[in-house]
């Protein structure tokens, strides 16, 4: 499947809260957001989709922004998607992050028409911009031990190479092919983002 010159998906938003009041008699809304669908192959600028929001009661983590395919800018989200590289306009932008939840996607900084895509933003850092035909890296995830094991969540995906001989970017630190991590979709297979997660820790 062709994925030339595409920006990568941004991670879902990462939020934490302590001292949340609840009772056994009160129902709470919990929604696990689906990961975004990756950019489609082929020679048309069909972009992927944003991830869906994850919700715990009044706390909403915004789904990750889709990466821009070819000449499209990245899309906004919890973390922003990376910009596509098939453009002659330096400064085309990555998607913007939601304040307090993540970082922006990488921006196109070149003027070639077949440059690599930029990386998606992560909870720990922004996605990096392309470098000519070489794609940008995904933003880093953040580690948490809330589940008893140190685990990375919400890393950004890697951009795809410029045509015909560029290189892929690196996935954001901590990105693995696993569900319920909130990672952005990478342009290396698999391209879809991972689903979100809600983790509740309480005193017994």
Where are these predicted regions, by residue range?
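Low-complexity, glycine/proline-biased repetitive segments and flexible coils/loops
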Residues: 1-204
């Amino acid at each position: 499947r062709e994925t030339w010159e595409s920006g990568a998906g941004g991670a879902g938003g990462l939020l934490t809260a302590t001292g949340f009041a609840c009772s056994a008699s009160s129902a709470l809304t919990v929604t696990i957001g689906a990961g975004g669908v990756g950019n489609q192959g082929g020679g048309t600028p069909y972009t992927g989709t944003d991830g869906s929001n994850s919700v715990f009661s009044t706390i909403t983590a915004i789904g990750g922004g889709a990466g821009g395919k070819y000449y499209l800018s990245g899309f906004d989200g919890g973390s922003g998607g990376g910009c596509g590289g098939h453009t002659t306009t330096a400064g085309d932008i990555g998607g913007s992050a939601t304040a307090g939840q993540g970082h922006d996607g990488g921006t196109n900084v070149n003027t070639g028409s077949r440059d690599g895509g930029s990386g998606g933003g992560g909870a720990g850092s922004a996605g990096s911009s392309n470098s000519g035909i070489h794609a940008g890296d995904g933003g880093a995830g953040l580690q948490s031990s809330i589940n008893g094991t140190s685990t990375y969540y919400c890393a950004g995906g890697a951009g795809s190479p410029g045509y015909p001989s560029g290189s892929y970017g690196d996935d954001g630190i901590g990105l693995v092919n696993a569900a319920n991590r909130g990672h952005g979709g990478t342009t290396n297979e698999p391209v879809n983002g991972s689903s979100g997660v809600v983790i509740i820790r309480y005193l017994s």
